[in-house]
């Protein structure tokens, strides 16, 4: 087989970011009910996102109908692309989904957060043909050097979305249905009534700062909280900072004087 470089395409080993849907039970009725409950408050949040089904948390001897789980995820508008399984879980290929390898970007939490669901995107690797060119070295920065802070000084209305490769500063209101996303920190010097997602590539040190917190959803590194879990009175509508501590969102009053 010739490895001569083609001017028309490249085929190489690589990695892509995707969500992991970790299955912890074989009770598909309970799983379906919980999935619907989680998504009914924010049906658009994961719409069209790719997801890998992770069955490594199942006990020895347990198995699930992956075709049914695949359909469940499709029903909430997610796109299953593969399965992550242990070597002993040979049944995981029965649904026709490819087996993938996953490298979690953080150690697994000892206990799930009471008010947030971890959905951080690990790197999922798919094997490919030998590359004609070298691939990036492991540990290389995933974000270009010298990324500048993005400043938005206009109101964001329902349906609008802003994405920042680094930090994001917003100087005007974020309305219901609007979404602001950053790979770094988010600063909002106005009311936040839409969705704010910081550290979206797994940056657990990212924070959200806001002078008036009234959000539909807040998220750091994929750990999120929605309006189905009302905010305490001491932070609702107030100046706050939001950070992660042991897989839990901490929302703290921000005293500016």
UniProtKB/Swiss-Prot annotation:
UniProt feature, compositional bias: Low complexity: 123-141
Gene Ontology biological process: cell morphogenesis; division septum assembly; regulation of cell division; regulation of cell septum assembly
Pfam families: MinC_C, MinC_N
Residues covered by region (Disordered): 123-144
Gene3D superfamilies tied to this protein: 2.160.20.70, 3.30.70.260
Keywords: Cell cycle, Cell division, Septation
Function in brief: Cell division inhibitor that blocks the formation of polar Z ring septums. Rapidly oscillates between the poles of the cell to destabilize FtsZ filaments that have formed before they mature into polar Z rings. Prevents FtsZ polymerization.
Subunit-level organization: Interacts with MinD and FtsZ.
Family: Belongs to the MinC family.
Record HAMAP family: MinC
Protein name as annotated: Probable septum site-determining protein MinC
Organism name: Burkholderia multivorans (strain ATCC 17616 / 249)
Gene name linked to the record: minC
């Amino acid at each position: 087989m010739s490895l001569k470089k083609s001017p028309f395409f490249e085929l190489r080993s690589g990695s892509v970011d995707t969500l992991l849907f970790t299955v912890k039970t074989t009770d598909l009725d309970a799983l379906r009910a919980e999935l619907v409950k989680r998504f009914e408050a924010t049906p658009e949040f994961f719409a069209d996102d790719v997801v890998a089904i992770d069955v490594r948390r199942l006990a020895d001897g347990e198995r699930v109908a992956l075709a049914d789980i695949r359909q469940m995820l499709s029903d909430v508008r997610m796109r299953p692309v593969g399965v992550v399984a242990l070597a002993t879980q040979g049944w995981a290929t029965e649904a026709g989904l490819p087996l993938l390898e996953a490298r979690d970007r953080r150690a697994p939490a000892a206990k799930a957060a009471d008010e947030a669901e971890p959905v951080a995107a690990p790197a999922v690797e798919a094997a490919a043909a030998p590359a004609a060119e070298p691939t990036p070295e492991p540990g290389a920065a995933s974000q270009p050097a010298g990324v500048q802070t993005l400043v938005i000084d206009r109101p964001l209305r329902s349906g609008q979305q802003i994405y920042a490769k680094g930090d994001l500063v917003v100087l005007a209101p974020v309305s219901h249905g609007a979404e602001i996303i950053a790979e770094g920190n988010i600063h909002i010097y106005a009311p936040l009534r839409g969705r704010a997602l910081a550290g979206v590539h797994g940056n657990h040190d990212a924070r959200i700062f806001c002078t008036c917190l009234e959000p539909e959803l807040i998220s750091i590194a994929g750990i999120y909280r929605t309006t189905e879990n009302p905010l305490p009175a001491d932070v609702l509508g107030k100046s706050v900072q939001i950070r992660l501590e042991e897989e839990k969102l901490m929302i703290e009053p921000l005293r500016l004087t």
